[in-house]
Design a protein with these regions (language model features):
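Intrinsic-disorder-associated, low-complexity terminal segments enriched in Asp/Asn/His/Tyr and depleted
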Residues: 3-6, 12, 27-31, 46, ...
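Residue-identity detector for glycine
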Residues: 16, 38, 43, 53, ...
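N-terminal, charged/glycine-rich beta-strand/loop interface patches
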Residues: 79-219, 224, 231
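Acidic (Asp/Glu-rich), glycine- and aromatic
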Residues: 223-231, 236-263
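A structural signal for small-residue-enriched, beta-sheet-centric alpha/beta enzyme cores
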Residues: 248-381
Length: 381
C-alpha cells in the first residue's frame, strides 16, 4: 500500500504563483497500486480529477480515494488516483488546500514603487535653465537638448514601465519668474490591474508671474480592473500663463479589451494667488462601468481628455478655441470658469482623440504665442 505524507514541500504566493506538492511513498512497488474498487492500476493517471478530501459512499473515511497533485521528475504535473490511509480529521492536512481557495488574493505586503521627481526652472540671460532637480526611482527627468542650450522641454520617464496597485508616483514642476518650459512624458502611462490598493499619482505645478508652463503628458491607459487615484494640483500667480492636459484611455483597443471593473479617481485643484478658482473630480467605480454607454455618461467613448488654459485675453481665446473644437470629429466642449478656460474632449478611440489634441495644439499654440504651447516632440516618437 502506498502511503502519502501530508504536505512535503509547499511554495505558494497568493498572486497566481505555483503550489507544488511532492509525493512520498514507502512502498517499493510504485507501479502497482490497489484502488478501493479492487482493480489494479499500472501507475496510469486519471484524467478526471476528484476533489481532495471527498470520500466514496460506503467506504471508511480512512481509506477513501484521494486525488493528489504530483510534480514528477520530468516537471510535468499529473493527477494520480491512489489509496490514502491518512486521517482526514487532521487539520494540518485538509485545511491547507482549502486555504488556498478561500483566502482572497491581495497585493498587500508586496514591493511597490515610490517614485518622485522635482524640477525647478528659472530664467537667465541665455534662456530657461535648471535651478534644481531631484529624482527617485522609478521616476526620471530627461531633456531632449542637454548641455548649455536653453531648456525648452522636459520629459518625465517611468522606468518601471507602468503603474501597479500600491505604487506611488509624485511629480512637481515649478516655473520661476520668466521661465518657459513644456513638460511631457516619454510614452503612454499604463495602469495595471490592482487587487486591493490603488495606484496613487500626484502632480504639482506652480507657475510664477511672467512664467509660461505647459503640462502635456501622453495618455494614461487604464487596464481592466485597474485602480487609479490621481490628483493634479496647480498654483498660479498673476501674470503667469499655463496650458495643462490630462487624458485617459479605457482599455487597450488593439487587444479588444473592454474595461468592466476597477476604480478611477482623477481630480484637479487650481489656485490663483492662493485662492481656489476651480476644482473638478472625475470618478468611476466598479458598478459604474456597466453603464458607461449611456448618453449621460461617456456614451461609449473610451478616450477622454481635459484641457485647461490660464492667461491673458481669455474671452478672445475662448472663442478661438471654440471654433477649433467645432471643426473636430470627436465630441468637444469648452467654457470659461473662474478665470480659467476648461475644455473637454471625448472619442471612441484613443487615436481619434490624439489627432484632435494635436490639432488643438497646432492651431491654439500659435494663437497664444507658441513657445512651450505646441505639440511636444515626444508625441511623434
Amino acid at each position: 500500500m502506498t502511503h502519502f505524507s501530508h504536505l512535503a514541500w509547499r511554495e505558494d504566493l497568493l498572486q497566481g504563483k505555483r503550489c507544488r506538492w511532492l509525493r512520498k511513498s514507502t512502498d517499493l512497488d510504485h507501479d502497482k497500486r490497489t484502488t478501493e474498487s479492487g482493480s489494479r492500476s499500472r501507475g496510469k493517471f486519471n484524467r478526471e480529477p476528484a476533489m481532495l478530501g471527498t470520500s466514496q459512499a460506503g467506504h471508511s473515511p480512512l481509506s477513501h480515494r484521494r486525488t493528489v497533485l504530483v510534480r514528477s521528475q520530468n516537471r510535468r504535473t499529473s493527477w494520480c488516483n491512489a489509496m490514502s490511509p491518512l486521517d482526514i480529521t487532521d487539520p494540518s492536512i485538509l485545511s491547507r488546500p482549502a486555504d488556498l481557495c478561500a483566502e482572497p488574493l491581495s497585493d498587500k505586503g508586496l514591493q511597490r514603487a515610490d517614485g518622485c521627481g522635482r524640477l525647478v526652472l528659472s530664467c537667465s540671460e541665455h534662456g530657461t535653465r535648471i535651478e534644481d532637480i531631484f529624482e527617485r526611482s522609478p521616476t526620471r527627468i530627461m531633456f531632449p537638448r542637454p548641455g548649455s542650450r536653453p531648456v525648452e522641454e522636459a520629459v518625465i520617464i517611468n522606468t518601471g514601465g507602468g503603474v501597479a496597485g500600491g505604487d506611488r508616483l509624485e511629480c512637481s514642476v515649478t516655473a520661476l519668474p520668466g521661465a518657459s518650459i513644456a513638460v511631457t512624458s516619454l510614452a503612454a502611462e499604463k495602469v495595471y490591474r490592482a487587487l486591493h490598493d490603488p495606484a496613487r499619482v500626484s502632480n504639482r505645478l506652480k507657475a510664477h508671474e511672467s512664467s509660461r508652463l505647459a503640462w502635456l503628458p501622453q495618455e494614461t491607459i487604464i487596464f481592466n480592473w485597474a485602480r487609479l487615484h490621481r490628483t493634479t494640483e496647480i498654483e498660479l500667480f498673476s501674470g503667469s500663463e499655463l496650458l495643462a492636459l490630462e487624458w485617459l484611455v479605457l482599455g487597450r483597443a488593439a487587444h479588444g479589451e473592454i474595461v468592466v471593473g476597477g476604480s478611477i479617481s482623477d481630480s484637479w485643484h487650481v489656485k490663483k494667488d492662493g485662492r481656489l478658482i476651480w476644482a473638478d473630480s472625475f470618478r468611476i467605480a466598479d458598478e459604474t462601468f456597466a453603464h458607461l454607454n449611456r448618453k449621460a455618461l461617456l456614451s461609449n467613448c473610451n478616450a477622454i481628455a481635459t484641457l485647461i488654459y490660464f492667461g491673458p485675453d481669455l474671452d478672445k481665446r475662448l472663442e478661438f478655441l471654440r471654433e477649433i473644437l467645432l471643426s473636430l470629429e470627436c465630441n468637444c466642449a469648452v467654457t470659461l470658469v473662474g478665470g480659467l478656460i476648461v475644455a473637454r474632449c471625448a472619442a471612441r478611440l484613443s487615436s481619434d482623440l490624439k489627432l484632435a489634441l494635436r490639432s488643438i495644439l497646432q492651431q491654439f499654440g500659435p494663437e497664444i504665442g507658441s513657445g512651450p504651447f505646441r505639440v511636444p516632440k515626444m508625441w511623434s516618437c
